[in-house]
């Protein structure tokens, strides 16, 4: 960072100067501020910062042709044509590139942009399969107002970067400038206009864009994002070191090539719901472009090769909600209820006609409200795809990185579980798998795990709603061989860049084996990607490449799509009576598909209904006959059984044969489908099973018809011919045996038989025509509640505390007799009710009721919840279906034909609303017991007290006070560690006595800073080498060597100075300023100004009792004496004219060679004459006085002040 002008002439304050010394300069200046707040949000990384470490630059992209030549500065779709016309540029031929042959060549776009010193040539093609034909964007207002406009996706593009076709991916929109993702193998870029709404100004000098880059070693977007209730993982900083090799291997083995469209494509038609918080953040004028760009990225994620299936995410409808509706759907802090509200809302938006353009398979809801705990990004049911209510997800929108959240939650709905939770794919979590419990995927590093692929393949075939294609099949015919349109020179340019062409430096035996390319600047340096040229590439006059060989092309080897042949005649009927089916088939042989051609689309069979006449045995049950056939052939549990028909509860299993044992009641699958023409359900007399699938048939006998019978069996009737019959019979047991009560005629429907009072008797029913009992024979009474099939209909029998009930929807195919098996002499009373067509009534039947509503009726069930908890709301009556006989609530389907009463409205909760307040939960245990990363979290919610002593969560904006903190640091003490000593350094001298040093660090098991309780090992020691050689160069001169060894001394202790290494001198001229010496305790400043700080500490700490600051015991310690004393051999030469003097407080001594005197550190020393002469008696070094004076006035003042404090301390 350059200093501001005049900085040398002004005095900087110490704090500012310290920042100038310690802070590194920024990589680039920030972009200019936007014009308004809306632009400010757009200028930041999409949806907020991309995370710490994201770099940004300004760039001006331009539109080019396929060769990278400038076409226009206009990049927006709205003005691109005008820009080209303004320049009157000649038409430029823009051929399509490999992998993008879905559209006309003229629809491709090419852009050049320079990002961080790299010139990128973007090759784009329209993403024509993101927005379905007829898709709309709907604005739902506060008072039920709705505004609908067409949803256009004409400015959405996907593609790659030239030269990196297999290792790059681009998803951009050019609605208003370029916005979206540019992904390459090792890094990713986001690009968006610096300011929006300036497309009209592009033609003059281009348009400034912001480009963000995330390096491959940085954490993923926004850090790990919690999904569902996933547990936190290790930090990415530690993972980057441990997974470096694995990521390199994974990146090299996993290709991100864009998939070609396959015949087994699945299309998820999406309703995208957006609440008001998202609209307000992005702005009404920009939200549509943002949503299309976001979903374009989601679509690219589902096109990744690792998924193992080709799934298209197709937008059919976008709904933007008002503020009031948004607040009613999202319940703060309650993700389960919020998801239920969103799914219910999406279900209500569904179009009733499945053929409608806006009919959706799946709903995605985006919000910026905090619907769950802190960090929760999404919520979704598992395996809910195609379900009318459960196929929905709730997602927290937070910029383009939310694309991974949407993909993750939609993966749950498709049946995928979290990686590492219940499966064995935990090893793929750290590599950036989409279904990780925490979002760790990034645009340069993401994939679907092997478990996700397996779980998807397990369920995908059952999602029938994904099989239809919302797009019209009017695409242009694809070339039979792609190489027919590209020469080898063009393919070399696609592979290696501009200028490259086919290598001619050597002749290969067959040029179709591998494509070799070279540049004219170095024609003898040929390169290849070890792949052959495209099939159809011309390789010799009249010859073309095909499957790696240069051959003559003949019609029999070209790609050929299949086509259906003629239908065969209809075969025989599957049944002789009771309605069967007959089939006809066709073959895909006109012609057969060949050489990779498409197979025929559609079903290979067709069927018709046949043999519709009733069977002679009116009581025959076709499903029962199929089960009965196994009585003699199928043993279960080493025993034979009498098999009865059973209807499976799952509608998808009803065309598979399940039978129930009469002896044990056990239900067994016969592992086969029912015969064609079997009724799907006993509740539907017309729909039939055809090849394992239930085909809807109306009562009019038309396949696919929705026409139904009324309550008494009239097809399309209005119940006008229906009559209700009821009665009550009371009998007293007079003898043993059955007591006959009454008969119910054939044709009766909606039959209900019930005891008036609970008794010990047993109800029995007999088929009058066959004489066989269908319920409770005298010697075989089963009083347990059950559902069974008899006489071709399903019966429900219940015994509730001795009160028996029997009912069936009918119709009865024969008359039944109702009897009672008496137990005791208690009177028994039975009531019965049923509906029957008036033509089937007996003339003398006096129990006919004229009204149709005698069996069931609508009754008040409860009041709906109040629309407001306070401040005056409203609630409405909710009705349920009630049986008149006993006033029990039953399924509302029984009252479907009755007119429902109009709801009644009333006021509720008129009391005034209380002021919401912040409510905090208990702090959770600290995430760490020691170290520097411990954190505690707690829940913080805005709660509004209600009048009934309950509370509810509301939006944070309703609380006036400052939001309490939800995270805080904890347990930040250093962890226990152990001393680790390094190797000893070389001796400080080459001869004589010196010192050695070594680093001693306190480290924990994971090699982080720690605190050690044990005594620290020594960091310095003496070393003794051989005696130094004498000076024989000038015998007339005499030299003396004073050997001085440092050793701890209580009077002159050694001081510790913490640093990361030996001081190499000051690194800034500002270090000499005494006013900055107060910052020497800061490690960063001490390292920067180590020399000045050492001098300052030596002068101000005479006794050397400075202790290292708390928590800093992990640095390398360098031992230095408190006052400058010699640590190496010091040579003293006597002057010829003056007596020899030693300036170290020399005095007389009695030391001799035999009795050496000890010096200031109790180390024996000797004074050696270099020529064995007698040493001067006054050459004895003494301990220097700590009170010596200095010429520096300021330093002397500090020394005097310290001396005074020391003297006062002694007194």
Curated annotation (Swiss-Prot):
Glycans are attached at residues 112, 251, 949, 993, 1031, 1098, 1145, 1150. The precursor is cleaved by a furin endopeptidase. Residues 266-470 form the Peptidase M12B domain. A motif (Cell attachment site) lies at residues 691-693. Expressed at high level in skin, bone, tendon and aorta and at low levels in thymus and brain. Residues 1059-1097 form the PLAC domain. Disulfide bonds join 343-392, 386-465, 425-451, 492-517, 503-526, 512-545, 539-550, 573-610, 577-615, 588-600, 987-1023, 991-1028, 1002-1012. Transmembrane segments: none annotated. This is A disintegrin and metalloproteinase with thrombospondin motifs 2. The gene is ADAMTS2.
């Amino acid at each position: 960072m350059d200093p501001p002008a005049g900085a040398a002439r002004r005095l900087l304050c110490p704090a500012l100067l310290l920042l100038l010394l310690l802070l590194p300069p920024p990589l680039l200046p920030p972009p200019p501020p936007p014009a308004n707040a809306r632009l400010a949000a757009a200028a930041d990384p999409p949806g907020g910062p991309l995370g710490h470490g994201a770099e940004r630059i300004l760039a001006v992209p331009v539109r080019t042709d396929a060769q990278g030549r400038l076409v226009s500065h206009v990049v927006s779709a709205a003005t691109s044509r005008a820009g080209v016309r303004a320049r009157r540029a000649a038409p430029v031929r823009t051929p399509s590139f490999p992998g993008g042959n879905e559209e006309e060549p003229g629809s491709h776009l090419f852009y050049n942009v320079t990002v961080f010193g790299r010139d990128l040539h973007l090759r784009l093609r329209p993403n024509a399969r993101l927005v379905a034909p007829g898709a709309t964007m709907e604005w739902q207002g506060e008072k039920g107002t709705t505004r609908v406009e067409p949803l256009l996706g004409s400015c959405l593009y996907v593609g790659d970067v030239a030269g990196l076709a297999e290792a790059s991916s681009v998803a951009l929109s050019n609605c208003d400038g370029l916005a979206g993702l540019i992904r390459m193998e090792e890094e990713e870029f986001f690009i968006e206009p610096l300011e929006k709404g300036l497309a009209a100004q592009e033609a003059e000098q281009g348009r400034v864009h912001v480009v963000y880059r995330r390096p491959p070693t940085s954490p993923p977007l926004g850090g790990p994002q919690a999904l569902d209730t996933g547990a936190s993982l290790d930090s990415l900083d530690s993972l980057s070191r441990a997974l470096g090799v694995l990521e390199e291997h994974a990146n090299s083995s996993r290709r991100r090539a864009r998939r070609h469209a396959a015949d087994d494509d699945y299309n998820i038609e999406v309703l995208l719901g957006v609440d008001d918080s998202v609209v307000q953040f992005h702005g009404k004028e920009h939200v549509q472009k943002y949503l299309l760009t976001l979903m374009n990225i989601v679509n690219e994620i589902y096109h990744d090769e690792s998924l193992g299936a080709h799934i298209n995410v197709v937008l059919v409808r976008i709904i933007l909600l008002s503020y009031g509706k948004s607040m009613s759907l999202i319940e703060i802090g309650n993700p389960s209820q919020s998801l239920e509200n969103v799914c219910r809302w999406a279900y209500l938006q569904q179009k009733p006609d499945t053929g409608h353009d806006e009919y959706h398979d799946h709903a995605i809801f985006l919000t910026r409200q905090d619907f769950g705990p802190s960090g929760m990004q999404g919520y979704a049911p598992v395996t809910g795809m195609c379900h009318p209510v459960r196929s929905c997800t709730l997602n927290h929108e937070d910029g383009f990185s939310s694309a991974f959240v949407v993909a993750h939650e939609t993966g749950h709905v498709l049946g995928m579980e979290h990686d590492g939770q219940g499966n064995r794919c935990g090893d793929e979590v750290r590599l950036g798998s989409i279904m990780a419990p925490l979002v760790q995927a990034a645009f340069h590093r993401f994939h679907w795990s092997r478990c996700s692929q397996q779980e998807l393949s397990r369920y995908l075939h059952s999602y029938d709603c994904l099989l239809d294609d919302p797009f019209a099949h009017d695409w242009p015919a694809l070339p039979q061989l792609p190489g027919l349109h590209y020469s080898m020179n063009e393919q070399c340019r696609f592979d290696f860049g501009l200028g490259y062409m086919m290598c001619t430096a050597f002749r290969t035996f067959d040029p179709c084996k591998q494509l070799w390319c070279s540049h004219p600047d170095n024609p003898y340096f040929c390169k290849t990607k070890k792949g052959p040229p495209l099939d159809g590439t011309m390789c010799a006059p009249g010859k073309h490449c095909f499957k790696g060989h240069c051959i003559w092309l003949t019609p029999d080897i070209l790609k050929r799509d299949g086509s259906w042949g003629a239908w065969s005649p209809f075969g025989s009927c599957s049944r002789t009576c009771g309605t069967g089916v007959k089939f006809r088939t066709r073959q895909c042989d006109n012609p057969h598909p060949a050489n990779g051609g498409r197979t025929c689309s559609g079903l290979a069979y067709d069927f018709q209904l046949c043999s519709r006449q009733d069977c002679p045995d009116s009581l025959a049950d076709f499903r029962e006959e199929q089960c009965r056939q196994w009585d003699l052939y199928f043993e279960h549990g080493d025993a034979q059984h009498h098999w009865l028909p059973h209807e499976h509860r799952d509608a998808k299993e009803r065309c598979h044969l399940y039978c129930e044992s009469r002896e044990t009641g056990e239900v067994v699958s016969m592992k086969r489908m029912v015969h064609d023409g079997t009724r799907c359900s006993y509740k539907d007399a017309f729909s039939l099973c055809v090849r394992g699938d239930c085909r809807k048939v109306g009562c009019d006998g038309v396949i696919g018809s929705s026409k139904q019978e009324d309550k008494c069996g009239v097809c399309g009737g209005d119940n006008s011919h229906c009559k209700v019959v009821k009665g009550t019979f009371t009998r007293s047991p007079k003898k043993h045996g059955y007591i006959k009560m009454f008969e119910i005629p054939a044709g009766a429907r909606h039959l209900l038989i019930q005891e008036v009072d609970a008794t010990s008797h047993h109800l029995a029913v007999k088929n009058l025509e066959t004489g066989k009992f269908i319920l409770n024979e005298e010697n075989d009474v089963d009083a347990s509640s059950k559902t069974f099939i008899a006489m071709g209909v399903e019966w429900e029998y219940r015994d509730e505390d001795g009160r028996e009930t029997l009912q069936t929807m009918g119709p009865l195919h024969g008359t039944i007799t109702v009897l009672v098996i008496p137990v005791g002499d208690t009177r028994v009373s039975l009531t019965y009710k049923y509906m029957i067509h008036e033509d089937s009534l007996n003339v003398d039947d006096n129990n006919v009721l004229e009204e149709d509503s005698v069996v069931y009726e609508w009754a008040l069930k409860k009041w709906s919840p109040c629309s407001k908890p306070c401040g005056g709301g409203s609630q409405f009556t909710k009705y349920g279906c009630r049986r008149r006989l006993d006033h029990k609530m039953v399924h509302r389907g029984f009252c479907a034909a009755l007119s429902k009463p109009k709801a009644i409205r009333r006021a509720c909760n008129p009391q005034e609303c209380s002021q919401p307040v912040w409510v905090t939960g208990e702090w959770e245990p600290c995430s760490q017991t020691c170290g520097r990363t411990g954190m505690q979290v707690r829940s913080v919610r805005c709660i509004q007290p209600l009048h009934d002593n309950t509370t509810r969560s509301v939006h944070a904006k309703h609380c006036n006070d400052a939001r309490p903190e939800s995270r805080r640091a904890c347990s930040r003490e250093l962890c226990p560690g152990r001393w680790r000593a390094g190797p000893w350094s070389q001796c400080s001298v080459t001869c004589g006595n010196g010192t050695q040093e070594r680093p001693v660090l306190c480290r924990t098991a994971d090699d982080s800073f720690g605190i050690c309780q044990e005594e620290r090992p020594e960091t310095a020691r003496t070393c003794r080498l051989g005696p130094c050689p004498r000076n024989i160069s000038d015998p007339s001169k005499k030299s003396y060597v004073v050997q001085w060894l440092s050793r701890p001394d209580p009077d002159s202790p050694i001081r510790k100075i913490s640093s990361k290494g030996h001081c190499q001198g000051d690194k800034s001229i500002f270090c000499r300023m005494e006013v900055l010496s107060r910052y020497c305790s800061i490690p960063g400043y001490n390292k920067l100004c180590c020399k000045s700080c050492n001098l300052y500490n030596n002068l101000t700490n005479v006794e050397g009792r400075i202790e290292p600051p708390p928590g800093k015991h992990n640095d390398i310690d360098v031992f230095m004496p408190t006052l400058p004393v010699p640590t190496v051999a010091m040579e003293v030469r006597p002057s010829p004219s003056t007596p020899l003097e030693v300036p170290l407080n020399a005095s007389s001594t009695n030391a001799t060679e035999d009795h050496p005197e000890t010096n200031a550190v109790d180390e024996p020393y000797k004074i050696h004459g270099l020529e064995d002469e007698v040493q001067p008696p006054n050459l004895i070094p003494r301990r220097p006085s700590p009170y010596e004076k200095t010429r520096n006035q300021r330093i002397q003042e500090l020394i005097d002040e310290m001396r005074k404090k020391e003297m006062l301390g002694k007194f």
